[in-house]
């Protein structure tokens, strides 16, 4: 499958993604809050093999129980998390404070992907290990083309 076709199935232009993704509590869309823990900053790799599609998302520090992976109508894979990363300062000495804090994570992660026709919606599996969420979707076997008889109109 070409890169253009994969982009058609998996990638949404930012303008469309902005419409689909929910608005944050502050009223900003996820695209507008870029750089402040936006879910658009979550690195994602999508691998297509001959037998399956594999999604890799880096979301360190979130509890596995706070991550939801669902398949919605219209062949849409949805990955959500409302979890908050636990900071090391919960256990630090009283009077300690961060002087630099760059490792922020989306507070409300929502990622949606339109899946291709050959994705087997019943075979979706997910695992979360060492801060990486891996979602695997098997491919359906190719369907042989069905011949279609066309009626010829007589005029």
Swiss-Prot record:
Keyword Manganese: no
Annotated disulfide bonds: none
Subcellular location: Cytoplasm
Residue stretches making up the sHSP domain: 35-155
Cytoplasm keyword on record: yes
Alphabetical list of Gene3D superfamilies matching this protein: 2.60.40.790
SUPFAM superfamilies from the UniProt entry: HSP20-like chaperones
Gene Ontology cellular-component terms listed: cytoplasm
Swiss-Prot/TrEMBL keywords: Cytoplasm, Stress response
Principal subcellular localisation of the protein: cytoplasm
Subunit structure: May form oligomeric structures.
Family: Belongs to the small heat shock protein (HSP20) family.
Protein name: 17.4 kDa class III heat shock protein
Organism encoding this protein: Arabidopsis thaliana (Mouse-ear cress)
């Amino acid at each position: 499958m070409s890169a253009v076709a994969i982009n058609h199935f998996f990638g949404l232009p930012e303008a469309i993604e902005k419409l689909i993704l929910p608005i944050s509590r502050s009223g900003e869309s996820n695209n507008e809050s870029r750089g402040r823990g936006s879910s658009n900053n979550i690195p994602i790799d999508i691998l297509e093999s001959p037998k399956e599609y594999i999604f890799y998302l880096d979301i360190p520090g979130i509890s596995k129980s706070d991550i939801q992976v669902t398949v919605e109508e219209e062949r849409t894979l949805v990955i959500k998390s409302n979890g908050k990363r636990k900071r090391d300062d919960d256990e630090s000495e009283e009077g300690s404070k961060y002087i630099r804090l760059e490792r922020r994570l989306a507070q409300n992660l929502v990622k949606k992907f339109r899946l291709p026709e050959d994705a087997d919606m019943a075979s979706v599996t997910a695992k979360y290990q060492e801060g990486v969420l891996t979602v695997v979707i098997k491919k359906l076997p190719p369907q042989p083309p069905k011949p279609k008889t066309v009626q010829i109109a007589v005029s």
